[in-house]
A protein has these predicted regions:
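Helical transmembrane-bundle signal
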Residues: 11-21, 41-51, 90-101, 123-126, ...
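Membrane-helix interface motif
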Residues: 53-61, 186-196, 264-272, 391-406, ...
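Hydrophobic transmembrane alpha-helices and their helix-loop junctions in integral membrane proteins
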Residues: 99-109, 113, 123-138, 148-461
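Juxtamembrane boundary at the C-terminal end of a transmembrane helix
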Residues: 500, 606-613
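Transmembrane helix-loop-helix hairpins at membrane boundaries of multipass inner-membrane proteins
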Residues: 1-8, 16-119, 197-201, 555-559, ...
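Hydrophobic alpha-helical transmembrane segments
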Residues: 77-93, 208-223, 419-426, 521-553, ...
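Cytoplasmic/organellar membrane-interface segments at the starts of transmembrane helices
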Residues: 243, 374-380, 430-547, 565-603
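Hydrophobic alpha-helical transmembrane segments of polytopic
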Residues: 7-17, 33-47, 86-93, 115-122, ...
Length: 613
């Protein structure tokens, strides 16, 4: 184990950079502010990467601020604990922040230094969230993420749509934060501790009483709000639709996934010792939530015409897939989820940048209004189309490697339906993006500007993000999209990625090793060698089915005769009615969303109380 102040530097660096931007604001030089922000993000990412390498080679690194180290297993101080998965997630945050800052080089003349400073604060909060070993600091970074995210969403407070999206974001995530805080308070009342390792050690071996179960339900519900798990997901599409493209890169690429990371970290360190005998019941609850999220997100994605909303619901669908991987409660599912999160985040970030390019050139993001307008953007069209197939798990993209690892872990536990679930969700989600690519970049399909109720608000949610002339696309806009897509491909091609992920996941779920490293400064015991078999023939067949199914469904929906949509067939009529009902649930009213969060919390906590005692 390595103990030093170095692991904290990645979080301190963005805060210092944001402060420097504030100090130089009087100079009024926008390019200087952007250069400082990019340099700061690069420095913090390099520091995170060093932390990651050190954690892989030498074991977990623990930093105790102010030198307040534990005595006799009692932790009073605040710590950062760097393990491979946490450091890897923080590094991924840094990479996406760099991409967002590069893309935003020509953004927001009117807000000056505010936008890059907020992005750096957002980055620092996400990195701190990934590295924190203290449950209350998790909450602090959770709230800081929300505050910075709200400010970034409402980048134009004089416009109604960004303000509404930020309001939905603020209200829903504030309730999520409140749930987490109450859950932490209950845990503190039971254990008198805030350090994750110490809480886990104190609960280990004891039967979970009502207080512990209620705290678990509240904490999981609160972080499910951030992750946008159904039915806590309603705020997300409104925020994505109105947030600027650079912010969407971070929202879709990593912010939602951080909510799932928190659930995994807190479960394995804090609750696994006391809930270990109820793993099967917990799997059932979490798998159900993951499957529902994957299918509803995919369905809503296919119903969208607003490209940002489409990708927002794609994010929700894949959050469901990630939750399924975590819900298996073993290192194999967690390793697959880690790979899947990185690869999918890179691809979705690339797709959002493509949408940003379209918004720059055409000032629109509705696929019907963009009909054929992307013909003069062939490179962007290629990236967008390949990205759509990558969402379907096309080999050799990293998303294929990640989902096949989860599927193998699920089959090993007898969950035969998980590969089918992933295939259906990927087909529907990818088909929506394929349909949009054909309509926008090839001009296929009917030129129909009318759409389902509630879908014609795309223009009022869209503003001109990039100032200046828009008759050409600067390389700084489209180049990050290509690089991110290639990075998503590289995740699946680099030798040994699955082996590193499996080893990191095995250390993540080794709660006794984590507790020993944090509370007693002892290196964790050597884990048995990781066995990695790689994707099987069945995995490739599922991937081929997903990719082919997405192409057929996407092109079929695009080329279906217009009169078929108005068919009097009972099947079509019922499908339209069901689609209208599902869309109607996403009303955009904060009161409705609060009601769903309340209902979801009651259902989840009730399920825990009934099955985990």
């Amino acid at each position: 184990m390595i103990s030093s102040v170095f692991p904290a530097l990645p979080v301190a660096t963005p805060f210092l950079g944001a402060g420097l931007l504030g100090a130089t604001q009087s100079l009024g030089r926008r390019r200087l502010a952007e250069a400082i922000a990019i340099a700061t993000a690069v420095a913090a990412t390099v520091l995170c990467a060093i932390d990651l390498v050190l954690a892989i080679r030498h074991g977990d690194a623990v930093t105790w601020f102010g030198g307040w180290q534990p005595r006799h297993g009692v932790a009073i101080g605040v710590s950062f604990t760097i393990d491979p998965l946490g450091a890897g997630l923080a590094t991924f945050v840094g990479l996406l922040t760099i991409a967002a800052l590069v893309f935003s080089w020509r953004h927001f003349e009117s807000v000056g230094h505010v936008f890059p400073a907020l992005l750096l604060v957002f980055m620092a909060a996400m990195m701190g969230f990934s590295l924190s070993g203290d449950i209350f600091n998790l909450f602090v970074f959770f709230e800081l993420m929300s505050i910075a995210g709200i400010g970034l969403t409402c980048h134009r407070p004089d416009e109604g749509a960004p303000l509404q999206g930020a309001l939905n974001f603020a209200i829903t995530n504030a309730i999520g934060g409140f749930l987490v805080l109450i859950g932490i308070a209950l845990l503190y009342g039971r254990t008198g501790a805030l350090n994750l390792a110490q809480i886990g050690a104190m609960l280990d071996g004891h039967r979970a009483d009502g207080l512990v179960l209620v705290s678990f339900g509240l904490i999981v519900s609160g972080f499910f709000v951030k992750a946008a798990v159904v039915p806590f997901h309603f705020w997300l599409a409104d925020a994505y639709a109105t947030a600027p493209t650079p912010v969407c890169i971070l929202f879709a690429g990593v912010m939602s996934e951080l909510g799932l990371y928190a659930v995994a970290r807190i479960y394995w360190v804090v609750y696994a010792g006391t809930l270990g005998s109820h793993q099967e019941a917990l799997r059932t609850i979490l798998l159900t939530a993951g499957a529902l999220t994957a299918l509803l997100g995919a369905t809503m994605c296919f119903l969208q015409r607003h490209l940002k909303r489409m990708l927002a619901f794609a994010t929700i669908s894949y959050v469901g897939c990630f939750l399924v991987g975590i819900a298996l409660l073993d290192s194999g599912g967690l390793a697959g989820t880690a790979i899947y999160v990185v690869a999918d985040g890179l691809v979705k970030a690339s797709l959002f940048i493509c949408v940003g390019v379209l918004q720059h050139r055409c000032s629109r993001v509705d696929e019907r209004h963009l009909h054929g307008l992307g013909r003069n953007l062939p490179f962007t069209g290629i990236v967008f189309f390949v990205g759509a197939l990558a969402l379907a798990g096309l080999p050799p993209f990293g998303s294929f490697l990640g989902k096949s690892t989860i599927e193998d872990a699920a089959l090993a536990r007898g969950y035969w339906w998980v590969p089918a679930l992933f295939t259906v969700a990927e087909i529907i989600t990818s088909a929506a993006v394929v349909r949009a690519a054909g309509r926008v970049f090839l001009g296929w399909g009917p030129r129909d500007a009318s759409g389902p109720a509630g879908e014609d608000r795309a223009d009022e949610e869209t503003s001109q993000e990039i100032e200046g002339r828009n008759d050409r696309t600067p390389a700084l806009l489209w180049l990050p999209a290509a690089i991110l897509l290639l990075a998503g491909l590289a995740v699946g091609l680099v030798p040994g990625v699955d082996r590193v992920a499996q080893a990191a996941a095995a250390r993540f779920v080794d709660r006794q090793g984590y507790i020993a490293a944090v509370l007693h400064a002892r290196p964790p015991a050597t884990l048995p060698p990781v066995s990695v078999s790689g994707p099987s023939l069945a995995d490739y067949l599922y991937a081929a089915g997903s990719s082919l199914g997405a192409l057929l469904l996407g092109l079929g929906a695009l080329l279906l005769p217009r009169h078929a949509h108005d068919s009097p067939s009972v099947i079509f009529r019922r499908a339209r009615a069901a689609a209208g009902w599902i869309r109607g649930l996403h009303s955009g009213h904060p009161g409705d969303y609060v009601a769903w969060v309340t209902a979801g919390t009651a259902i989840l906590a009730g399920a825990f109380a009934l099955t985990l005692r």
